[in-house]
Amino acid sequence: MQTPPTPLSSLTPHKLRLRRLGIDTYQEPVLYMHRDCRVCHSEGFEAQSRVELALGDRTIVATLNVVSGDFLAPDEAGLSEAAWRLLGAQEGDMVSPRHPAPIESLGHVRAKVYGRHLTQAAITAVIEDVTAGRYSDLQLAAFVTACAGDRLDQEETVSLTRAMVAAGERIDWGEGLVMDKHCVGGLPGNRTTMVIVPIVAACGLRMPKTSSRAITSPAGTADTMETLAPVDLDVAQIRRVVERTGGCVVWGGAVRLSPADDILIRVERPLDLDSQGQLVASILSKKVAAGSTHVLIDMPVGPTAKVRSAEAADLLGRLLGQVGQTLGLRMRVVQTDGLAPVGRGIGPALEARDVLAVLRNLATAPADLAQRSLLLAGEVLEFGGAAPAGGGLALASAVLADGRAWRKFQDICAAQGGLREPPVAAHQQAVHALRSGSVLAIDNRRLARIAKLAGAPGAACAGIDLHVRPGEFVERGQPLFTLHAATPGELAYALEYAASQAETVHVLEDA
């Protein structure tokens, strides 16, 4: 039987009844109070005030939005979806909004704004407050901006990584090697992880891969894997999958590995700021937290990739290696071709289709995805001692060709909850070449933007099916790529943008 609401006459002057408003504010907790609310007046709360709410053993700090009219009663406090989840609230729960304690660590953020070096203790204090949700998005933006560019030195990068690890969960795999691989990113369709993990696991090495969802790309590895099998596994479930199969491909966010990183990324994305120190801390904090011992870094280099020059790649590679070694990781960095997308599909389901084609050894499998996966799998096998120096590629190729990789992938998917086929978009339309000539270049960033406008990764079936590669000759009117969308509106939106970006696939007209 549902508990009746508390009579208004029994409410104390500082208690408000909670309402779930169903407002999506992404990950930012937001509190809504009426302009005539007695607590607003007694506490001096104004719009954008930071307000602390406690319920049972949970406490959150939310940003206040003040409303008028009949949207909310003066004796009610409304919560966004993010705030509701964090507080673990039920309709009608009573709370007493209050001012949060001053955030002492903001002094360290101000110091960094003025160029001061931050100690381990200072960075730890900041990250603890970030993870506890005490920072508003404006305060998070100040920290991210203060650390942007090259403002974090190597010592601060190590300190940031350690603080981010300490703020979350850690997985302990006991004795033995734990292999891992990470791609720096910026290359659409580069879904090699889902081919590498079953190859490596089939050769007897452990590879429990915790992957991310898309941040600025049309698909992350977790998004793509989720079209084939469940990825929201807790630590106990991950351990069972790895004990049974030797590997997994799961979403790291489900097990709170380096939760501060997810919070900082939320603010970094709209600011579009690059920070080598934060990038290195983001990558390595999750590797340390995941219990990895050996980490292979795939670093695509190209004019429209995330890393645009060999010099920048060398600098980032050295920093990753030095920080990783300080944290007890064995590191290996491989620079790869970042000139064009990998495979044909861009978007979760389309990339999953390519992965399945490679693992099943189908004639339609994209050769570049297969070759790149085998090269990196070979590096991991040599790194872990499963193959002699120079013999990794041959072993990886044999495991893929004889079906062992496909069987292992099926085992992993079954252990994670079952293998399924990726969805297909209901709405598709091709974009054609405006002239005959050779494909000179493909702009990774523009192509990724078009795929996102089509609905990826939110709509798993959405994205782009690429039909041409650099160096190929195309005729006028030949399809360059096909847009996939879940709705006609998203398809039209993506087509409009694609039409305005004629050089996304740069065709050089023959003289």
Swiss-Prot record:
Keyword terms, alphabetized: Glycosyltransferase, Transferase
Cited Pfam families: Glycos_trans_3N (PF02885), Glycos_transf_3 (PF00591), PYNP_C (PF07831)
Domain of life according to the entry: Bacteria
Reactions the enzyme catalyzes: thymidine + phosphate = 2-deoxy-alpha-D-ribose 1-phosphate + thymine
EC number(s) from the headed UniProt entry: 2.4.2.4
Gene Ontology, cellular component aspect: cytosol
UniProt cross-references to PROSITE patterns, sorted A to Z: THYMID_PHOSPHORYLASE
Protein name: Putative thymidine phosphorylase
Organism: Polaromonas sp. (strain JS666 / ATCC BAA-500)
